[in-house]
Amino acid sequence: MRLTPKELDKLMLHYAGALAKSRKERGIKLNYVESIALISMEIMELAREGNKSVAELMQQGREILKADEVMEGVASMVNEVQVEVSFPDGTKLVTIHNPIEDNGKLTPGEYILKDEDITLNANKESISIKVTHKGDRPIQVGSHFHFFEVNALLEFDRAQAFGKRLDIASGTSVRFEPGEEKNVNLIDFGGKQKIIGFNDLTNAHINKENKEQCLANAAQKHFIH
Protein backbone atom coordinates (compact mmCIF):
# COMPACT_ATOMS: atom_id res chain seq x y z
CA MET A 1 0.00 0.00 0.00
CA ARG A 2 1.36 3.38 -0.99
CA LEU A 3 0.12 6.56 0.67
CA THR A 4 0.57 10.12 -0.46
CA PRO A 5 2.02 12.70 1.96
CA LYS A 6 -1.47 14.18 2.35
CA GLU A 7 -2.93 10.78 3.24
CA LEU A 8 -0.14 10.22 5.76
CA ASP A 9 -0.92 13.59 7.37
CA LYS A 10 -4.57 12.61 7.70
CA LEU A 11 -3.62 9.29 9.29
CA MET A 12 -1.37 11.04 11.82
CA LEU A 13 -4.16 13.50 12.60
CA HIS A 14 -6.59 10.62 13.05
CA TYR A 15 -4.14 8.86 15.37
CA ALA A 16 -3.68 12.01 17.46
CA GLY A 17 -7.44 12.53 17.57
CA ALA A 18 -8.08 8.94 18.65
CA LEU A 19 -5.50 9.31 21.43
CA ALA A 20 -7.15 12.54 22.56
CA LYS A 21 -10.57 10.89 22.52
CA SER A 22 -9.26 8.02 24.65
CA ARG A 23 -7.86 10.48 27.20
CA LYS A 24 -11.08 12.47 27.23
CA GLU A 25 -13.08 9.31 27.94
CA ARG A 26 -10.75 8.61 30.89
CA GLY A 27 -11.52 12.04 32.33
CA ILE A 28 -8.20 13.66 31.39
CA LYS A 29 -8.47 17.32 30.48
CA LEU A 30 -7.15 17.91 26.98
CA ASN A 31 -4.43 20.37 26.05
CA TYR A 32 -4.39 22.67 23.01
CA VAL A 33 -2.99 20.14 20.52
CA GLU A 34 -5.23 17.33 21.74
CA SER A 35 -8.31 19.54 21.45
CA ILE A 36 -7.51 20.49 17.85
CA ALA A 37 -6.78 16.87 16.94
CA LEU A 38 -10.00 15.52 18.44
CA ILE A 39 -12.23 18.10 16.77
CA SER A 40 -10.48 17.58 13.42
CA MET A 41 -10.75 13.80 13.60
CA GLU A 42 -14.44 13.84 14.47
CA ILE A 43 -15.21 16.22 11.60
CA MET A 44 -13.30 14.03 9.14
CA GLU A 45 -15.21 10.94 10.25
CA LEU A 46 -18.60 12.67 10.13
CA ALA A 47 -17.83 13.95 6.64
CA ARG A 48 -16.76 10.46 5.54
CA GLU A 49 -20.27 9.18 6.33
CA GLY A 50 -21.46 11.35 3.46
CA ASN A 51 -24.84 12.39 4.84
CA LYS A 52 -24.08 15.81 6.36
CA SER A 53 -23.60 19.23 4.81
CA VAL A 54 -20.79 21.68 5.57
CA ALA A 55 -23.19 23.79 7.66
CA GLU A 56 -24.20 20.75 9.72
CA LEU A 57 -20.57 19.82 10.33
CA MET A 58 -19.80 23.38 11.42
CA GLN A 59 -22.58 23.14 13.99
CA GLN A 60 -21.61 19.67 15.21
CA GLY A 61 -18.00 20.76 15.49
CA ARG A 62 -19.05 23.15 18.24
CA GLU A 63 -20.59 20.30 20.24
CA ILE A 64 -17.61 17.94 20.42
CA LEU A 65 -15.82 19.51 23.38
CA LYS A 66 -16.93 21.49 26.40
CA ALA A 67 -14.83 23.99 28.33
CA ASP A 68 -14.64 21.77 31.40
CA GLU A 69 -13.13 18.95 29.31
CA VAL A 70 -10.01 20.94 28.41
CA MET A 71 -7.22 22.52 30.43
CA GLU A 72 -7.73 26.00 31.78
CA GLY A 73 -7.24 28.63 29.10
CA VAL A 74 -7.43 26.22 26.14
CA ALA A 75 -11.02 27.16 25.25
CA SER A 76 -10.09 30.78 24.62
CA MET A 77 -6.93 29.80 22.72
CA VAL A 78 -8.83 27.82 20.09
CA ASN A 79 -10.44 30.57 18.02
CA GLU A 80 -11.17 28.37 15.04
CA VAL A 81 -10.46 24.97 13.55
CA GLN A 82 -10.24 24.41 9.80
CA VAL A 83 -10.41 20.91 8.34
CA GLU A 84 -10.20 19.93 4.69
CA VAL A 85 -12.47 16.91 4.31
CA SER A 86 -13.79 14.71 1.52
CA PHE A 87 -17.47 14.74 0.59
CA PRO A 88 -19.19 12.61 -2.08
CA ASP A 89 -19.08 15.65 -4.38
CA GLY A 90 -15.48 16.64 -3.68
CA THR A 91 -13.12 18.14 -1.10
CA LYS A 92 -14.33 21.07 1.00
CA LEU A 93 -12.96 23.21 3.82
CA VAL A 94 -14.96 23.14 7.04
CA THR A 95 -14.31 26.10 9.34
CA ILE A 96 -15.52 25.96 12.95
CA HIS A 97 -15.41 29.25 14.81
CA ASN A 98 -14.98 29.16 18.61
CA PRO A 99 -15.40 25.38 18.77
CA ILE A 100 -15.08 25.18 22.57
CA GLU A 101 -17.47 27.21 24.65
CA ASP A 102 -15.48 29.41 27.02
CA ASN A 103 -16.03 29.03 30.75
CA GLY A 104 -15.41 32.67 31.61
CA LYS A 105 -12.05 32.06 33.24
CA LEU A 106 -8.94 34.11 32.50
CA THR A 107 -7.09 33.79 29.22
CA PRO A 108 -3.32 33.17 29.51
CA GLY A 109 -1.56 36.52 29.17
CA GLU A 110 -4.81 38.48 29.38
CA TYR A 111 -4.81 41.94 30.97
CA ILE A 112 -7.64 42.72 33.38
CA LEU A 113 -7.82 46.48 33.86
CA LYS A 114 -9.73 48.46 36.46
CA ASP A 115 -12.60 50.55 35.18
CA GLU A 116 -11.10 53.76 36.49
CA ASP A 117 -8.45 56.31 35.60
CA ILE A 118 -4.81 55.65 36.52
CA THR A 119 -2.71 58.53 37.83
CA LEU A 120 0.69 58.53 36.16
CA ASN A 121 3.74 59.05 38.38
CA ALA A 122 1.57 59.46 41.46
CA ASN A 123 3.16 61.00 44.56
CA LYS A 124 6.07 62.47 42.56
CA GLU A 125 6.74 66.19 42.63
CA SER A 126 6.69 67.72 39.15
CA ILE A 127 8.39 70.91 37.93
CA SER A 128 7.79 72.84 34.70
CA ILE A 129 10.61 74.26 32.58
CA LYS A 130 10.66 76.15 29.28
CA VAL A 131 12.56 74.49 26.42
CA THR A 132 13.57 76.16 23.14
CA HIS A 133 14.78 74.18 20.13
CA LYS A 134 17.74 76.02 18.56
CA GLY A 135 18.46 73.43 15.88
CA ASP A 136 17.13 72.81 12.37
CA ARG A 137 15.88 69.22 12.74
CA PRO A 138 13.16 67.68 14.93
CA ILE A 139 14.27 66.20 18.26
CA GLN A 140 12.35 63.50 20.09
CA VAL A 141 12.95 62.78 23.79
CA GLY A 142 11.80 59.54 25.41
CA SER A 143 10.09 59.21 28.77
CA HIS A 144 13.12 57.89 30.67
CA PHE A 145 15.92 59.88 29.06
CA HIS A 146 17.89 61.95 31.58
CA PHE A 147 16.54 65.33 30.55
CA PHE A 148 19.68 67.10 31.76
CA GLU A 149 21.53 65.29 28.95
CA VAL A 150 19.12 65.76 26.06
CA ASN A 151 20.29 67.15 22.70
CA ALA A 152 22.81 69.98 22.99
CA LEU A 153 20.64 72.22 20.79
CA LEU A 154 17.75 72.29 23.27
CA GLU A 155 18.03 75.42 25.40
CA PHE A 156 16.71 75.31 28.97
CA ASP A 157 17.87 75.46 32.59
CA ARG A 158 19.88 72.24 32.73
CA ALA A 159 20.61 72.68 36.42
CA GLN A 160 16.89 72.32 37.14
CA ALA A 161 16.70 69.22 34.96
CA PHE A 162 19.54 67.38 36.72
CA GLY A 163 18.36 63.94 37.87
CA LYS A 164 14.96 64.31 36.22
CA ARG A 165 12.97 62.83 33.36
CA LEU A 166 9.78 63.74 31.52
CA ASP A 167 6.53 63.43 33.46
CA ILE A 168 4.84 61.31 30.79
CA ALA A 169 3.79 57.68 30.38
CA SER A 170 6.56 55.09 30.03
CA GLY A 171 7.44 54.36 26.42
CA THR A 172 6.07 57.65 25.10
CA SER A 173 8.01 60.73 24.04
CA VAL A 174 7.91 64.49 23.44
CA ARG A 175 8.82 65.96 20.06
CA PHE A 176 10.45 69.36 19.61
CA GLU A 177 10.21 70.97 16.17
CA PRO A 178 12.96 73.36 14.94
CA GLY A 179 12.50 76.78 16.52
CA GLU A 180 9.72 75.55 18.80
CA GLU A 181 9.39 76.76 22.37
CA LYS A 182 7.33 74.77 24.85
CA ASN A 183 7.01 73.96 28.54
CA VAL A 184 7.54 70.40 29.76
CA ASN A 185 7.03 68.81 33.16
CA LEU A 186 9.84 66.85 34.81
CA ILE A 187 9.99 64.45 37.76
CA ASP A 188 12.84 62.83 39.67
CA PHE A 189 14.31 59.53 38.52
CA GLY A 190 13.47 56.61 40.79
CA GLY A 191 15.51 53.56 41.69
CA LYS A 192 19.08 53.80 42.95
CA GLN A 193 19.54 57.38 41.75
CA LYS A 194 22.55 56.45 39.61
CA ILE A 195 22.62 57.56 35.97
CA ILE A 196 24.94 55.90 33.46
CA GLY A 197 25.29 56.49 29.72
CA PHE A 198 23.06 58.83 27.71
CA ASN A 199 25.46 61.63 26.60
CA ASP A 200 28.10 60.81 29.23
CA LEU A 201 27.53 64.00 31.20
CA THR A 202 26.69 62.28 34.50
CA ASN A 203 27.81 58.65 34.98
CA ALA A 204 27.38 59.04 38.72
CA HIS A 205 24.85 59.16 41.53
CA ILE A 206 22.41 62.06 41.51
CA ASN A 207 23.46 64.32 44.39
CA LYS A 208 24.66 67.85 45.07
CA GLU A 209 28.30 66.78 45.18
CA ASN A 210 28.19 65.45 41.60
CA LYS A 211 25.88 68.10 40.16
CA GLU A 212 28.53 70.83 39.73
CA GLN A 213 30.89 68.46 37.92
CA CYS A 214 28.08 67.35 35.62
CA LEU A 215 27.22 70.96 34.80
CA ALA A 216 30.88 71.56 33.99
CA ASN A 217 30.83 68.50 31.70
CA ALA A 218 27.81 69.92 29.87
CA ALA A 219 29.51 73.29 29.39
CA GLN A 220 32.71 71.66 28.16
CA LYS A 221 30.77 69.70 25.54
CA HIS A 222 28.90 72.84 24.45
CA PHE A 223 25.41 71.83 25.61
CA ILE A 224 23.25 74.97 25.48
CA HIS A 225 22.28 76.09 28.98
Curated annotation (Swiss-Prot):
Catalytic activity: urea + 2 H2O + H(+) = hydrogencarbonate + 2 NH4(+)
InterPro entries referenced in this protein's UniProt entry, alphabetically: Urease_beta-like, Urease_betasu_sf, Urease_gamma-beta_su, Urease_gamma/gamma-beta_su, Urease_gamma_sf, Urease_subunit
Pathway involvement of the protein, from the record: Nitrogen metabolism; urea degradation; CO(2) and NH(3) from urea (urease route): step 1/1
Keywords: Cytoplasm, Hydrolase
EC number: 3.5.1.5
A biological process term (GO) from this entry: cellular response to iron ion
Region (Urease beta): 103-225
Location in the cell: Cytoplasm
Gene Ontology MF: a single term: urease activity
Family stated for the protein in its record: In the N-terminal section; belongs to the urease gamma subunit family.
Protein known as: Urease subunit alpha
